[in-house]
Curated annotation (Swiss-Prot):
Keywords: Mitochondrion, Ribonucleoprotein, Ribosomal protein. The lineage of its organism: Eukaryota, Amoebozoa, Evosea, Eumycetozoa, Dictyostelia. The gene is mrps8. GO terms for molecular function: structural constituent of ribosome. It is found in: Mitochondrion. This is Small ribosomal subunit protein uS8m. The keyword Transmembrane does not apply. It comes from Dictyostelium discoideum (Social amoeba). Belongs to the universal ribosomal protein uS8 family.
């Protein structure tokens, strides 16, 4: 968990400094989160630069006015305080400007992925909300593209 918090802190610091990339120590969970960020278009990508030390370079992404799509990255559930959500309540969460990472028996998934999986199940599954990524307010065209990407 601390590695992931360090990664989030490095990303935030890099975005504030308008850096093109940041280097962090990776783990399986870090790679999983970074691949989701890359798929969602929140970062340009990432690359392992030293396998023996597990160092990863994260390439940050900016809009034309040099502002980031990422507004905040919050670690919600920690060891002592966990936040769970029932499957029936997943439909009520608005994914328009926030990206939720939920840990369920299917592993770590974004909220739209879990909603799609729940459509196939008799009883919808919930899970533990691990991370919330707040996306900056963007122009409506980009926001529509993000919504369409989640629907596909």
């Amino acid at each position: 968990m601390k590695k992931l918090q360090n990664v989030f802190a490095a990303i935030k610091t890099g975005l504030l400094a308008k850096a093109t990339s940041v280097t962090v120590i990776g783990s399986k969970r870090v790679f999983e989160i970074l691949s989701r960020f890359e798929n969602e278009g929140l970062i340009r990508g990432f690359q392992i630069i030293d396998i023996s030390k597990n160092k990863v370079s994260i390439y940050l992404k900016y809009k034309q006015d040099m502002t980031s799509l990422l507004s905040k990255i919050k670690v919600v559930s920690v060891n002592k305080e966990k936040l769970y959500i029932k499957g029936k309540l997943l439909k009520k969460l608005n994914t328009g400007v926030n990206m939720y990472f939920v840990e369920s028996k299917f592993g770590l998934q974004t909220l739209p992925q879990l909603k799609i999986r729940n459509k196939r199940l008799y009883a919808p599954l919930g899970g533990e909300i691990k991370y919330i990524v707040e996306i900056n307010k963007v122009n409506p065209k980009i926001q529509e593209l993000i919504k369409k990407k989640h629907e596909i």
